[in-house]
Amino acid sequence: QNAQTNAMAQEPVLNMPVAQQRRASEPAAPYIGQLVTKISVKGNKITKAEDIEAVVTTKPGMQLTQEGLAKDLHAIYGLGWYYDLQPEFTKVPEGVQLTYHVLENPVYKKLEVEGNTKISTSEIEKILDLPKDQIININDVNIKVQRLEAEYNKQGYILARVADIRMLPDGTLLLLVNEGIVEDFKVKGNVKTKDYVITREMKLKKGEPFNAKDARRSMQRIYNRGYFE
């Protein structure tokens, strides 16, 4: 008797939602408490089954538990190489055989970036420094994205964030960047001085990404005009 979850997702994602973990665990219910006689991995073409076997806590000879299975699924995703994972349970006289069906992330081919105006795509590619023609690792991407956000911060764009990361089946890594656009200025507390007299001194412009360095310079220019104490 075999029990396997529904068809795996067709489009890669760079995380494992809690709901997806729950769905992956559901078929285990009839086998909880039974002895695990064998663990195997299928679907891996580049990565090694031994890497998965090394991180799972449920071993042959142990009882299958819901908590242990959930922990193991999380650990396998935590390796960063897979965008989908489904456990299969096969009933045998001695207990149950457990097979992990994995789908590896695509091989990285090219980078596309949307929303970037202050750091060019070519410069972002250098900052990320991801190896091409190799299977993408989610953990590596997340670390490199933090490096990109740190570079934005260094340049003064402290509100800039990578809002979304997508790995497309053709090997394209797509980054959606939100640089923290200034939508408007509001001036409060000025009784005698008109708003435009203050805002014209601002180096920051509406529709441009917020820059902390420009904001400080703008405030200094306003104070230097002697409008305020």
Question: Language-model segments: which ranges?
Answer:
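Periplasmic polypeptide-binding modules associated with outer-membrane biogenesis and secretion
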Residues: N2-E229
